[in-house]
Every structure is written in structure tokens, then in C-alpha cells.
């Protein structure tokens, strides 16, 4: 079976009071991965990162859960992007 890849553009958001940043994952993690969080391989403008899609307590305006993927400072430096910038994201589940 072919592995599903999620590909989209997202604005990098600043993590308040932590100096970090993240992008939203615009899919329902429970529906897509049958779990509340998922270990993923992500690429931000082609720069690889292994991390997780998680719920950090954020909600969309309609009240639904907003899942996020952290984007490390080192990766932001490599792709020359900061909070407020648009980034191309590719995500796939990792074992």
C-alpha cells in the first residue's frame, strides 16, 4: 500500500512566551492516524524534520481541535523563514 503524504502551505506561527514556532496540520489527526498524536517525518521547504503532530490545546475559531508540528529554530534559519512567513510542508507518518 502506498504511503499517504500530506502536502500544503502554512504560515509559521509563533509559540507564545516560548520563542518557538509551529505550523498547523490542517487535518483531523484522529481520523487520519487513528491516534491523538502521531510521529511524523516532515519537510519544511524541503528541509527534513522528524517530530510529532500534537494537540497543544489550541482551537480553531469553530471550536475544533488545532493540531500542530513544531518547527525548530535551526530549520527556520536554514530555510530563512520566521513566524509570519509562508512555508511549504510535506508530512508522512513514520514508524
Question: Predicted regions span which residues?
Answer:
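Long, compositionally biased stretches
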Residues: 1-65, 83-95
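Short alpha-helix capping/helix-loop boundary micro-motifs
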Residues: 28, 71-78
Amino acid at each position: 500500500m502506498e504511503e499517504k503524504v500530506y502536502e500544503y502551505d502554512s504560515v509559521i506561527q509563533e509559540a507564545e512566551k516560548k520563542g518557538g514556532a509551529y505550523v498547523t496540520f490542517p487535518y483531523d489527526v484522529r481520523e487520519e492516524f487513528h491516534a491523538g498524536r502521531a510521529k511524523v517525518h516532515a519537510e519544511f521547504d524541503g528541509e527534513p524534520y522528524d517530530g510529532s503532530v500534537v494537540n497543544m490545546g489550541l482551537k480553531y475559531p469553530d471550536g475544533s481541535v488545532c493540531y500542530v508540528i513544531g518547527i525548530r529554530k535551526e530549520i527556520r534559519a536554514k530555510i530563512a523563514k520566521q513566524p509570519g512567513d509562508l512555508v511549504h510542508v510535506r508530512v508522512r507518518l513514520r514508524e
